[in-house]
Amino acid sequence: MLFEGLELVSALATLAACLVSVTLLLAVSQQLWQLRWAATRDKSCKLPIPKGSMGFPLIGETGHWLLQGSGFQSSRREKYGNVFKTHLLGRPLIRVTGAENVRKILLGEHQLVSTEWPRSARVLLGPNTVANSIGDIHRNKRKVFSKIFSHEALESYLPKIQLVIQDTLRAWSSQPEAINVYQEAQRLTFRMAVRVLLGFSIPEEDLGHLFEVYQQFVENVFSLPVDLPFSGYRRGIQARQILQKGLEKAIREKLQCTQGKDYSDALDILIESSKEHGKEMTMQELKDGTLELIFAAYATTASASTSLIMQLLKHPAVLEKLREELRAQGLLHGGGCPCEGTLRLDTLSSLRYLDCVIKEVMRLFTPVSGGYRTVLQTFELDGFQIPKGWSVMYSIRDTHDTAPVFKDVNVFDPDRFSQARSEDKDGRFHYLPFGGGVRTCLGKHLAKLFLKVLAVELASTSRFELATRTFPRITLVPVLHPVDGLSVKFFGLDSNQNEILPETEAMLSATV
């Protein structure tokens, strides 16, 4: 017994020594990691590097960021201020909040900073995209892509978008059980991007498979760039390869069949616009371009659509006021009239309260956290040096949350954007859901168009209620969305705003 007791004590002592050694090793390595990045400061500049933590060697604070969500940024902003350093997704990063700070970054494109997304996003989106291009190449690509989102192009997309949304809402209302709004909004925006924006005639079964693959792709766009089996980065690369094959097949089939079209879709415009600028696009450029267009129309719009539905659920008075505006304009048509072409761009533009609702959703629930830049030359920001070679992320969501121009910043209040109040009129960099400067989101008008049509159709054709006891928590990666997807039961409404019986709803859905 004595020897057994001594052996146990010896084992515990060995374990304790190992734990102490590991703890000391972690502490020393973490300290060396902090010093390694502190040494990169520009010694010709007397200003200090921003305060903050670089986390653990190699992984930095990526784990904290993924687990804490919005709390990561807010806790560090409270501790270190509006400009702080961290290490995310395999690289050192300075995060920036506040209108004046963001203004300097956005207006400093090509002089102080240049765009550079995290490595995972650069690889997965591809080298031929607008997002990954810089300088003259970026300017030329924007000219080519801008025609896709012109007023004329949006007017041609509108009837098709309205029909896709009407079709989807009837399908939601015909379901006997609640639906997962975020997941179904992803299906809706993916269908809109593929069918309407790109004009692909992909069979329904193949479209469903592509959607599943695309979800895997989007979920890993922002991942630790470590190419190992079963890593998120590897899954993203595999998804990209499958998507590229599917897109090439769809593009080739589309180029061979130009008969029977009643409008020019984005791919038609993209090919024609590139020819006008003296360049014939290669197949790889077309594949990267279509992948980027789907990405732009899919993830962020699905996020905003889900946020819109959640806020209309939380604020029935807002929904009723929206219905009153539609009723006054003769647009409260009900689900019994699946008519194409009842909306026009000028009609949507005249709906002032609708515009306020969409703006407020985008203020409080901006789908993306911000934008990434690489520092071209050391400059000063908020009393700190931003060293050449470092990465900077300007924070859209936190700039909205801390903007002094907005009263009761955490309250959902569409009237803050009314003509009487116009809280966003003082300083354009307090409100920037679509970024700013030379890299303002090209598809912002399409996104707003989609959200407005969705709001009109929701108010006109649907009653909806939360299927859970409480509203879900929100997570931010890869874009803002409810952790459970938001479970909601939908019911169809007729032209008199009376609920449509399930049998009638099923008949309407079957005719689409």
From Swiss-Prot:
One Gene Ontology MF term: oxidoreductase activity, acting on paired donors, with incorporation or reduction of molecular oxygen, NAD(P)H as one donor, and incorporation of one atom of oxygen
Keywords in alphabetical order: Endoplasmic reticulum, Heme, Iron, Lipid metabolism, Membrane, Metal-binding, Microsome, Monooxygenase, Oxidoreductase
GO cellular component labels: endoplasmic reticulum membrane
UniProt-listed InterPro entries: Cyt_P450, Cyt_P450_CS, Cyt_P450_E_grp-IV, Cyt_P450_sf
Top-rank EC class of the record's enzyme: oxidoreductase
Cofactor(s) essential for the protein: heme
The enzyme's E.C. designation: 1.14.13.-
Binding residues for heme: 441
General function of this protein: A cytochrome P450 monooxygenase involved in the metabolism of retinoates (RAs), the active metabolites of vitamin A, and critical signaling molecules in animals. RAs exist as at least four different isomers: all-trans-RA (atRA), 9-cis-RA, 13-cis-RA, and 9,13-dicis-RA, where atRA is considered to be the biologically active isomer, although 9-cis-RA and 13-cis-RA also have activity.
Name of the protein in its database record: Cytochrome P450 26B1
